[in-house]
């Protein structure tokens, strides 16, 4: 782990000042810089442009070397706006890649791509920094044991379980509960696994980033009184940033997560919102660097760039990074190269359904569309696998019967189908769950449900033992015992009304 001042800091040491170049050309966020013969910087080195513009405003722009062009000239991509830069300006080669602060001091704080805090809470209290470019862990360091990452969320753990150290795609439109699900996962990993989370906001709306920060403070995921008690570090490179920043902000977040895994030996959750924007930024940079575009205008290095990021997200013998990535599918075309390349890396998909959200069933995870490579009897065990399959079959049959019910009504169904519908409606409601982070809004206390409890509950519903209970008893409860207790309370209330 490198211990040095971050390249983004205002001070660049006297040693680094020896290697000076000057700007020869500026095209948008891309700079060509000329260095003295024999003093060429390496690829990925950070360059710093300092000076004043025409109205004497201070300029401090960090760039990253992308190409060595020959004739002592390099091409670099700026990590912030290039407004005010001029030809002939002095450029300092820092002699190292971009480095960002890591460790416990990053929790509860918001950073930009350079690792600079942007939350007005003062400097970060750490001297430990780490370069954002590093190779993926070697094969010998990897933990190859397949194990489930228990989230405490019934619908996820039963029907589309997450792999420890795996990658999960999160699909869903606006307003179906992505943010609340993300915050609940951050909360549960801290409580159940003693782990921390890193959130990488890649090329999304600034307003959404601000909303997430405010909601995290409200729900206690970020502790304002004692910032060190927070459970998450935030790294933002939003839509208005140059493509260089959006392309590298995912690596900044990943570097912070790697420190928690490798040095603190913790289980880490890494959220990337949105992985498509990472690809999009790479495509913009690729065009600016003059590379020939590939299919649909994407960069020719699309698979390599995606692989470089994704291969660093894994389980090692020290700890694990489990990544949840929001995936935007352009024009709902799953064959588009960006989502298609992402799918190759995913172990599970969690699909959020607007129909379920409209019914008031939260989390609105679609039990039939969500998938996981972990749902195999040899991994999760026969009991879990059988229960999950029977739940899916019951829900699928209910879905097929809905058209008949809408036209002819329930009475026209056979006795067997009516029983299936009744159980499916109970299952649908039992898949809902009160969240800890939503206590503020719902007023009902959150519930963490262990996997064994989840399986027991669904087995009881499928066996028919609970057929006599009303379906509203299963809505927004934790384990099955709470559902039976709720049914007793409902019965008592009904008797009192009579």
Curated annotation (Swiss-Prot):
Subcellular location: Plastid, Chloroplast thylakoid membrane
Pfam families, per database record: ATP-synt_ab, ATP-synt_ab_N, ATP-synt_VA_C
Gene Ontology CC, one term: plant-type vacuole
Domain of life: Eukaryota
The UniProt record lists the keyword Membrane: yes
Catalytic activity of the protein: ATP + H2O + 4 H(+)(in) = ADP + phosphate + 5 H(+)(out)
GO molecular function ontology, one term from the record: ATP hydrolysis activity
Quaternary state and interactors: F-type ATPases have 2 components, CF(1) - the catalytic core - and CF(0) - the membrane proton channel. CF(1) has five subunits: alpha(3), beta(3), gamma(1), delta(1), epsilon(1). CF(0) has four main subunits: a(1), b(1), b'(1) and c(9-12).
Family: Belongs to the ATPase alpha/beta chains family.
Stated name of the protein: ATP synthase subunit beta, chloroplastic
Organism encoding this protein: Populus trichocarpa
Lineage: Eukaryota, Viridiplantae, Streptophyta, Embryophyta, Tracheophyta
Gene this chain is encoded by: atpB
């Amino acid at each position: 782990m490198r211990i040095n001042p971050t390249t983004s800091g205002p001070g660049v040491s006297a040693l680094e000042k020896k290697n000076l170049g000057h700007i020869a050309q500026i095209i948008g966020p891309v700079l060509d810089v000329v260095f003295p013969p024999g003093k060429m910087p390496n690829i990925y080195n950070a360059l710093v442009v300092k000076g004043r513009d025409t109205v004497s405003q201070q300029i401090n722009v960090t760039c990253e070397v992308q190409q060595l062009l020959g004739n002592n000239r390099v091409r670099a991509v700026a990590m912030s706006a290039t407004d005010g830069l001029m030809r002939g300006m002095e450029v300092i080669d820092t002699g190292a890649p971009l480095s960002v602060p890591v460790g416990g001091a990053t929790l509860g704080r918001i950073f930009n791509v350079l690792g600079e805090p942007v939350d007005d809470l003062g400097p970060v209290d750490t001297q430990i920094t780490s370069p954002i470019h590093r190779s993926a862990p070697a094969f010998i360091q990897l933990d190859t044991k397949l194990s489930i990452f228990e989230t405490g969320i019934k619908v996820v753990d039963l029907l589309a379980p997450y792999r420890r150290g795996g990658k999960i795609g999160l699909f869903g439109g606006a307003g179906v509960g992505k943010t609340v699900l993300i915050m609940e996962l951050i909360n549960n990993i801290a409580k159940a696994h003693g782990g921390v989370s890193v959130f990488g906001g890649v090329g999304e709306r600034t307003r959404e980033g601000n909303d997430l920060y405010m909601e995290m403070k409200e729900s206690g995921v970020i502790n304002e009184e004692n910032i060190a008690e927070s459970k998450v570090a935030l790294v933002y490179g939003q839509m208005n940033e140059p493509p260089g920043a959006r392309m590298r902000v995912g690596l900044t977040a990943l570097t912070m997560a790697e420190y928690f895994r490798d040095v603190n030996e913790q289980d880490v959750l890494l959220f990337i919102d949105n992985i498509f924007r990472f690809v999009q930024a790479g495509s913009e940079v690729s065009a600016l660097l003059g590379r020939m575009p590939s299919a649909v205008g994407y960069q020719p290095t699309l698979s390599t760039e995606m692989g470089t990021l994704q291969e660093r997200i894994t389980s090692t013998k020290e700890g694990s990074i489990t990544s949840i990535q929001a995936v935007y599918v352009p024009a709902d075309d799953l064959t588009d190269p960006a989502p298609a390349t992402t799918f190759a890396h995913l172990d599970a998909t969690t699909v959020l359904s607007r129909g379920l959200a409209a019914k008031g069933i939260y989390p609105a995870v679609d039990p039939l569309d969500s998938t996981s490579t972990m749902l195999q009897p040899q991994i999760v065990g026969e009991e879990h696998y059988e229960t999950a399959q029977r739940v899916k079959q019951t829900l699928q049959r209910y879905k097929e019967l809905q058209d008949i019910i809408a036209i002819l009504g329930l009475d026209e169904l056979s006795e067997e189908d009516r029983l299936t519908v009744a159980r499916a409606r109970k299952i649908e409601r039992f898949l809902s769950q009160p969240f800890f982070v939503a206590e503020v809004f719902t007023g009902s206390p959150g519930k963490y449900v262990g996997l064994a409890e989840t399986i027991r509950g669904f087995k009881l519903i499928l066996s028919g033992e609970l057929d006599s209970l009303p379906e509203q008893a299963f809505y927004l409860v934790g384990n099955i015992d709470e559902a039976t207790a709720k049914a007793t309370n409902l019965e008592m209330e009904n008797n009192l009304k009579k």
